[in-house]
Curated annotation (Swiss-Prot):
GO terms for biological process: cell differentiation; regulation of transcription by RNA polymerase II. GO terms for molecular function: DNA-binding transcription factor activity, RNA polymerase II-specific; RNA polymerase II cis-regulatory region sequence-specific DNA binding. Keywords: Developmental protein, DNA-binding, Homeobox, Nucleus. It comes from Homo sapiens (Human). The keyword Coiled coil does not apply. This is Homeobox protein Nkx-2.4. The lineage of its organism: Eukaryota, Metazoa, Chordata, Craniata, Vertebrata.
Length: 354
């Protein structure tokens, strides 16, 4: 920054303060047209929001007036801006003049960081019954809601100061801790299980085989022998009787299940199928009739018998050599042998076709 007064820069003190002063003049003109009831609350708000002057601020004022003048101008501009914003909000929401929800003393203590006693804040119903309610809701309320006023007595307000009694609940809960511990200690506990020695169990089982029920003198005598109490002997005999009955019942059910599971023996598997086979050779000689000889006990289809040779001879003409002299019987025998050989060959070829 140049030190010459002819050449000024926009960073000088006068250049910085001149726009703020012009803005303050504009907002102060706007405040003149604002409702008269807003001046006092906003002035009080600017007063309690500004920090209280201390020794350091007084020393700074004595040291130089220009910094304090700049700060004063800044605070004034901020107050003017807040006043203009409040005036705009009042115009927007039609806030009547003179309406105040809280006293200035309580609000000042709240904004300074010290809330103090919550009892300083009035109850909601007190404000509703005051003159502020008339400003908010009008002078002539709806007659339909006139009966509601009897429910809005002083008891309807919340007593915030009395909320400190809740700390007594925590103290009472802490005091109940020893009581719970004492009740748990006084509760009856189950006695631990007593394990008998092998000698004691052996003697008890031996006596149980002899006698399943004992009288009182017998129990006392047996208990004194094995160093037990009569009650322990009595309980052992009861448990052992129940155990024996349960084992007998399970054994009977198992036997019935085994007997029912056996059932009748399964049928034997079916024998392999037997097929009739024709007998073509019997005792080293071929069968002339070609009939099959089934084995005993078999019932198979019988093949039809071939036509006898004489009938075939009658049907077929004989060769002329047979009709010659001296060749009658020999020719017939030769023809019969040839025909029988042909029949045997046919049986060999077609004997298994059915």
């Amino acid at each position: 920054m140049s030190l010459s007064p002819k050449h000024t820069t926009p960073f000088s003190v006068s250049d910085i303060l001149s726009p703020i002063e012009e803005t303050y003049k504009k907002f102060s003109g706007a405040m003149d047209g604002a409702p008269p009831g807003l001046g006092a609350p906003l002035g009080a708000a600017a007063a309690y929001r500004a920090p209280p002057p201390g020794p350091s601020s007084q020393a700074a004022t004595v040291a130089g007036m220009q910094p304090s003048h700049a700060m004063a101008g800044h605070n004034a501009a901020a107050a003017a801006a807040a006043a203009a914003a409040a005036a705009a909000a009042a115009a927007t929401y039609h806030m009547p003049p003179g309406v105040s929800q809280f006293p200035h003393g309580a609000m000042g203590s709240y904004c300074n960081g010290g809330l103090g006693n919550m009892g300083e804040l009035p109850a909601y119903t007190d404000g509703m019954r005051g003159g502020a309610a008339t400003g908010w809701y009008g002078a002539n309320p709806d007659p339909r809601y006139s009966s509601i006023s009897r429910f809005m007595g002083p008891s309807a307000g919340v007593n915030v100061a009395g909320m400190g009694s809740l700390t007594g609940i925590a103290d009472a809960a802490k005091s109940l801790g020893p009581l719970h511990a004492a009740a748990a200690a006084a509760a009856p506990r189950r006695k631990r299980r007593v394990l008998f020695s092998q000698a004691q169990v052996y003697e008890l089982e031996r006596r149980f085989k002899q006698q399943k029920y004992l009288s009182a003198p017998e129990r006392e005598h047996l208990a004194s022998m094995i160093h037990l109490t009569p009650t322990q002997v009595k309980i052992w005999f009861q448990n052992h009787r129940y155990k024996m009955k349960r084992q007998a019942k399970d054994k009977a059910a198992q036997q019935l299940q085994q007997e029912g599971g056996l059932g009748p023996p399964p049928p034997p598997p079916p024998s392999p199928r037997r097929v009739a086979v024709p007998v073509l050779v019997k005792d080293g000689k071929p069968c002339q009739n070609g009939a099959s000889t089934p084995t005993p006990g078999q019932a198979g289809p019988q093949p039809p018998a071939p036509t006898p040779a004489p009938e075939l001879e009658e049907l077929s003409p004989s060769p002329p050599a047979l009709h010659g002299p001296g060749g009658g019987l020999a020719a017939l025998d030769a023809a019969a042998g040839e025909y029988s050989g042909g029949v045997l060959g046919a049986n060999l070829l077609y004997g298994r076709t059915w």
